[in-house]
């Protein structure tokens, strides 16, 4: 079986990207899907959010730089959910000067192993546009973009879509592309205005459930817990479970 490779990407920071990666993957795992999530950000926020605090453990850095297998570097962190940490050398990928265009194809080649049994491989990207993001985009089947409902995020989305179009042109294939509204404040007028603009330009590409802004989601990472462990049954946990169901069923606004 070939896993579906989902890149969680936004070149703007502070949009709930890692929060989405952590809680969506755990929700999918709770629904019985087999998931591997790769921390592809040298800051290692995803791994810390899942309770893996040893940032010196090798992970995807060893896969890309030394040819280790992904299976060797996978750590079971929850039922049905494996983690591949960033590793202390991941930042070296950005400084690679040898290999030409192959520098951007390291991850795709590492994921070609057909003996894996995951349903999904999620890649949590850094908020940048360098060699790491290029590797993720060359490997991706699908791109999931967390978005906040403010105008700066809207500007950043325009730039990101331009980047994605260039990769689609180079690969001669389209990505499956969807947006998730993160840190959404229903009572705020700007939230509704920005969502309306996004719906106009991306019809049928916004997952149906919005992730509402709550303090609980900001608190979880410091305890190394997902929202389902930190406050099971709360509004945010319900939001992420509904989002996971939207994701599986292709349910859009």
Regions found by a protein language model. Name each.
Residues 1-253:
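P-loop NTP-binding core
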